[in-house]
Amino acid sequence: MKKTIDLFCDIVDNYGDIGVVYRLGKELYNRNYKVRIFVNKLNEVSKIIKGCNSRLPYQVHNGIEFFDFNNFEINDTAEIIIEAFAVNIPESYLDKVNINTKLIINLEYLSAENWIEDFHLKNSFSPKPYIEKVFYMPGFTAKSGGIILDNYYLNLVDSIKKSRESYFNNFFKELGIKYSTDTYYINVFTYNWNFKEFIETLEKSPFKFVLFILDYKLDLNFSYKDKIEIYQMPFMDQNQFDIIINLSDFNFIRGEESFIRALLTGKPYLWNIYEQDEMLHIDKLEAFLERFREYFTADYNLYHDLSLNFNLNNNFGNSFLEFIARKHSSFEDYKKFIVTNCNLVEKLLYFIDSRTNQNQEEI
């Protein structure tokens, strides 16, 4: 009999959180778990998950059950509950929880900071005294909770590497863009930044650039020369997004879910980290860069300064041109370390099995 897992998620201002939860849900389902996802705005899920129906408060998609947690009816709760990113589980659900539920996992946001290893898998306050609740801390070390390495995506990365031109021409067929070896392709999915200054710097370069803009908030109301082509792309679902970041030579990327997909391409990227008060986001960025440092044989200081200036909205165009003019194996090397040592799903399921089997023996 399949073990059951319920995942809870809020959609707040962007779709990164539900993107993480859906990707996790798919991997759990593929490993023979019965998966249900409860989300506060089910009508918006269809924007990133192709095939979901925005008009239904309940549906099954690719084997996973989706519920609107403002409007659902269930008879039982799962053996394992995962609450993502401090979401509040509805009282109507908690009222049904009984001893059949073995474990509640508080899935936190990704971090490279050292302190997360001390909190990973430590007890958290549980709404039910007879159910264990723990913190689960995703991260970039073997002692952390790891990151989501879904097999579909890793296979896609390899497939596009082998047949990039074919994928490229098919994906951009409607736009009439054909792959060219003398063009540098850049994907832009960021929060607001000084985009005009960056373009002005690119114009001074001998490179030919094509930019794919995935952020509709960027101001494109300025002129640029013929050797720079800019395409404002329509909103993309998760599968389309996975393809375009692998087709690009460089990714400007924001958030957690998109950042991890960019990291797993093995290609260069700059992470636009979510801004926090008192510059806490810069501390988090510095922590990640420090993890990344050992994979650079050269140019670490250049990349470090690029990352900071990008996130502080300083002009970094000349440094960017200097960086991309050189070849870097560091991104592929770091990807290999992550794939080998930081598989979140494997770590999570190992922990779940150890805890639920222990609870069963105690019963």
How should each PLM-predicted stretch be described?
Residues 4, 79-80, 103, 185, ...:
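Structural motif
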Residues 8-31, 36-130:
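Active-site and donor-binding regions of nucleotide-sugar-utilizing enzymes
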Residues 10, 15, 22-25, 235-284:
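A donor-sugar binding/catalytic signature common to diverse glycosyltransferases
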Residues 99-103, 207, 267:
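A short helix->loop->beta-strand "cap" motif at the edges of active sites that frequently abuts
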Residues 108-195:
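A nucleotide-sugar donor-handling region in carbohydrate enzymes
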Residues 204-234:
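Catalytic donor nucleotide-activated moiety binding site of glycosyltransferases and closely related
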Residues 254-335:
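Catalytic binding pocket for nucleotide-activated donors in carbohydrate/polymer assembly enzymes
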Residues 338-363:
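C-terminal alpha-helical cap of glycosyltransferases
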